[in-house]
Amino acid sequence: RDSVNGRIPILLGVGGNNTRAIVDTLQNDDFTGVDAILSVVPYYNKPSQEGIYQHYKAIAEATELPIVLYNVPGRTGVNMKAETTLRIARDFKNVIAIKEASGDITQMDDIIKNKPANFDVISGDDGITFPLITLGAVGIISVIGNAFPREFSRMVRLALRGDYANALTIHHKFAELFKLLFVDGNPAGVKAMLNVMGMIENKLRLPLVPTRITTFEAMRKILDELNIKC
């Protein structure tokens, strides 16, 4: 809170696969200064679509804070389908958006076409942010933006303004880096990239380990060629 000093909204991650524990946190912890919470679809225990709905129902009823849903089946093991997302969005007014990282453009488009007016779709995948904005998404919660906040946010702003030609140029500039970030997993990828740029040490806690040297050198080569300003 002190670092951002009101310049940007604070989105706090409050999620997990224990609904009761999340509700307890929301009802008893101090959320002063928090603008909204980001809550991931329950992971590992693979609930049904009805279970996902009931999970978010309990969360929405436990707080007045705005809630951003987070669908990332590649990490959680279960996909929240469009109809479930839309049902939650319609039933709970404090559910204001979804960070969609399913990689399924058809599913995302279905949400965008049928969502309530007070509900936004946010990309959770850098590589499809540009096409998703052309369909009606409002932005991105980004990985590569940690390394290139200025240039990547410029792409987003151009796309939101309808300047697709210039936005696409930036999208293509980053294309290989989008892939390299996840070759050896993330956050190892973005930490390696930031290390190449001289911004941080390349240290991780187990079970995460640094990227392979081949990935690291590939990043160095592309960054040298692109000469992109952070």
Say what each PLM segment does.
Residues 1-77, 87:
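Active-site beta->alpha loop and helix N-cap motifs at the rims of alpha/beta catalytic domains
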Residues 11, 28, 134-137, 141-230:
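C-terminal alpha-helical cap/extension of soluble enzyme domains
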Residues 20, 24, 54, 83, ...:
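Short, contiguous clusters of charged residues that form electrostatic/catalytic patches at enzyme active sites
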Residues 61-62, 75-178, 182:
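Catalytic alpha/beta core domains of metabolic enzymes, predominantly
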Residues 71-72, 94-95, 205-206:
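Glycine-rich phosphate-binding "P-loop"
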